[in-house]
């Protein structure tokens, strides 16, 4: 059986005998060593998780390039992508897999899998907020963080105005990436910078790559981790 076939046709976790899965283990470890070297070298043993619909102990999946927002408005989705572009980021809200080092957080979206990029990858994260939508959109403090990144002229225009994202004028100012100061944005949004810090922070990490390898978190801990 070819590796791809094996990865796509593994057993359900509740039916697998981990102690008798040596063949699968050897093939998964070999696949990681042959195809995931950039991540292994950059992460230095750290892992991130993604919550996905269960599909076996290990499988590969193409990363979507056309993701649409589910938890936020299209305007905020486009704003976040625009801010990422300001700092030269490649991984954004449209073309990335969303990951976290907090397994429990990943489990709110599905079964927890260790996510490992196959081949080259890019990533974006923020040291200032853990969840972009929750921390920037759902409360007044988040709105203040956005205002703080505006360029001087736009910020002055709003200085004496009650900032209300439901007010048409202030909302249009806030959602336009052209109104932001790139140097200020770069303090809060890191593109391809400090991956180990990103993982250690437990914050949301967007990873852009062609393909992602997913490994059941229990199988990874019990069998795979000590070999990679």
Where are the model-predicted features located?
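Active-site and NAD+-binding cores of ADP-ribose-processing enzymes
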Residues: 11-22, 36, 117-228
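ADP-ribosyltransferase catalytic core
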Residues: 44-46, 57, 81-156
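Enriched but not universal
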Residues: 1-7
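Intrinsically disordered, low-complexity boundary segments flanking structured domains
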Residues: 28-41, 99-104, 191-194, 201
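ADP-ribose/NAD+-binding catalytic cleft of ART/PARP-like enzymes
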Residues: 7-92, 208-210, 216-228
């Amino acid at each position: 059986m070819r590796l791809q076939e094996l990865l796509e046709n593994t057993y359900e976790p509740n039916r697998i005998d981990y102690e008798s899965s040596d063949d699968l283990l050897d093939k998964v470890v070999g696949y990681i060593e042959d195809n995931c070297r950039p991540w292994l070298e950059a992460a230095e043993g750290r892992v991130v998780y993604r919550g996905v619909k269960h599909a076996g102990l290990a499988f590969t999946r193409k990363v979507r390039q056309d993701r649409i927002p589910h938890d936020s408005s299209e305007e905020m989705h486009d704003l976040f992508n625009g801010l990422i572009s300001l700092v030269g980021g490649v991984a954004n809200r449209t073309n990335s897999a969303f990951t976290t080092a907090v397994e429990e957080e990943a489990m709110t979206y599905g079964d927890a899998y260790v996510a490992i990029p196959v081949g080259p990858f890019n990533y974006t994260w923020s040291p200032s907020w853990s969840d972009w939508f929750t921390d920037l959109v759902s409360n007044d403090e988040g709105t203040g963080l956005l205002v703080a990144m505006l360029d001087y002229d736009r910020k002055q225009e709003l200085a004496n105005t009650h900032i209300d994202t439901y007010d048409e004028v202030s909302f249009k100012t806030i959602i336009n990436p052209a109104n932001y100061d790139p140097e200020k944005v770069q303090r809060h949004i890191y593109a391809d910078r400090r991956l180990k810090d990103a993982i250690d922070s437990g914050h949301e990490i967007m990873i852009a790559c062609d393909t992602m390898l997913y490994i059941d978190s229990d199988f990874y801990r019990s069998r795979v981790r000590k070999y990679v």
